[in-house]
A protein has these predicted regions:
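Active-site-adjacent loop/helix segments that line or gate small-molecule/cofactor pockets in enzymes
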Residues: 1-32, 87
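Glycine-rich phosphate-binding segment of PLP-dependent enzymes
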Residues: 50-51, 55-82, 89-107
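Structural signal for hydrophobic packing residues in well-ordered secondary-structure cores
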Residues: 12, 16, 20, 71-75, ...
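Generic structural signal for well-ordered, non-membrane alpha-helical segments
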Residues: 5, 29, 33, 60, ...
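Active-site and channel-lining beta-strand-loop segments
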Residues: 25-48
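PLP-dependent aspartate aminotransferase-fold enzymes
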Residues: 92-163
Length: 163
């Protein structure tokens, strides 16, 4: 049986929780630069790019080379458990770009939810205030704190009570 968008989306519906929404009714098979091909061979221009995390496009040669080189050294470790130099180097480079004559520190996280949660904690610690303003209809993530900030209930927290 050949793969189709419809058949794979049916499998997705059976295997993946409904909280992980999907905007487009296609299943990507491969991508390059700003182009994505679905499992049926149709070509699309990728305007989302991983929702703002893919600034270089799919399979940028420099990104692929850096990933390949890193895979020969270390695939993954939790920095909080075992530090590694590339993490420190990236933080140093980001810190150097931040304007101002004061000490800077950078935290690298995996998701936007983690970034939002840490930003809220930092803001609360810096101001001594507990309140946070969130806009109606805004999306901030899927963790408990970020769902509480997210003004878009459906599909993220519908039927779950107060966050």
């Amino acid at each position: 049986m050949s793969k189709t968008n419809e058949s794979l989306l049916q499998r997705r519906q059976a295997a993946v929780p409904r909280g992980v929404g999907q905007i487009h009714p296609i299943v990507a098979e491969r991508a390059e630069n700003a182009t994505v091909w679905d499992v049926e061979g149709r070509e699309y221009i990728d305007f989302a790019g991983g929702i703002a995390v893919l600034n270089t496009g799919h399979l940028h040669p420099k990104v692929v080379a850096a990933v390949q080189e890193q895979l020969t050294k270390l695939t993954h470790t939790c920095f909080q458990v075992l530090a590694y130099e590339p993490y420190v180097e990236v933080c140093e480079k980001i810190n150097a770009k931040v304007p101002g004559d004061f000490a800077k520190k950078t935290l690298l996280v995996t998701t936007g939810s983690e970034a939002v949660e840490n930003a809220v904690k930092i803001a609360r610690a810096a101001t001594g205030r507990a309140g946070v303003i969130a806009f109606t209809g805004a999306y901030h993530g899927r963790t408990m704190m970020t769902l509480g900030l997210t003004g878009k209930v459906v599909p993220y927290s519908a039927g779950m009570g107060l966050m």
